[in-house]
């Protein structure tokens, strides 16, 4: 993964799932991630705007918390059998996001934040959408239509 590549996630290449509600949330998240990526790339050119990066990071994390809470709620309401596994992935990523935000607030290291974004979060998100979210969306789409 190249941390100098924008967008971080090409919205046209974002894997789609069977439940449009989930696709909408993913598109919102990608917009926030790409805004953060733009700030980080600007920072790599020596024009670091700590406040803008902090704002983008906080908005992304807040959205991700709401995203995961919404998915978790739907899985619980509709009795999704592997809910604990899917929720466990959400919990792990939220822990990592909280840690990277804490690290950013302490060190203001744009390179470390970019490394996390491209090397940790991006492959996780891609795999999560293609596996966990695809299965979950298929299940939810079926039970919500019946």
Predicted regions and their residues:
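Small-residue-biased structural context
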Residues: 1-146
